Amino acid sequence: MAPLLQIDDLHVAVDGAEILRGVDLTVGSGEIHALMGPNGAGKSTLAAALMGHPAYRVTAGTIRFDGQDITDWPTDVRAKAGIFLAFQYPEAIEGVSVTQFLRQAMSARKGDDISVLEVRFAMNEWMERLGMDPAFGERHLNTGFSGGEKKRNEILQMALLEPRLAVLDETDSGLDIDALRVVGRGIHTVRESHPELAVLVVTHYQRILEDLLPDRVHLLFDGRVVETGGPELARRIEAGGYEEWRS
């Protein structure tokens, strides 16, 4: 069986500067992978390139999703195919409620106009499972949200949109230990209902991985994946930093 995500020799440039210099990465359906690396290694660039951000230009290599070459696909087509990106810093949208946003997103994902009643029913079910206040749906999207609330909102989106691959770009940034546990448990709660969901977590830190329990950990350094291992690789990085790869 072909992997869900296969990246081969991917080169990506931003504003004419090459950031990714030949990334190879494979993620199977239902697997959790972590991508670690120092600042400037290209982690967020890879996340943006996977989602088809137009500012991130693929200059060589391929991205295959479920056996199809999606290297040139626009962002909306990738999203409809089942790729989900959780941003490091989600945008606040004044005047648009969480419910309104999710109705539009769910309708686009499923290719059908979903009623407000159907959205509210699905939201209430998942908010109860995720330990969220039902009134959360009436708040304006990410407006005045704490860091933990923004991440809960993204987990709610992930649950309702039912992607096949979720890319979490530094979702642990700025979160305390309790909020990290909420994120980790929330992801596992979603995967209980959708065990085929694959997750690629982009992170600097090993802490969130203690709850997520990744199958594979990849080290991105200077635009390339230079080492792949299990959770022990994350512990090595946490203990000693990146010095052994700088030499």
Model region roles, listed by residue range:
Residues 85, 89, 95-110, 122:
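Q-loop/switch helix immediately C-terminal to the Walker
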Residues 36-38:
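The feature captures the beta-strand-to-loop junction immediately N-terminal to the Walker
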Residues 158-159:
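ABC ATPase C-loop
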Residues 216, 220, 224-247:
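Conserved beta-strand-loop-alpha-helix hinge in the C-terminal portion
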Residues 5-7, 20-22:
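Conserved structural motif at the start of ABC-family nucleotide-binding domains
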Residues 57-59, 69-84, 237:
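ABC ATPase NBD coupling module
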Residues 170-171, 178:
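Walker B catalytic motif
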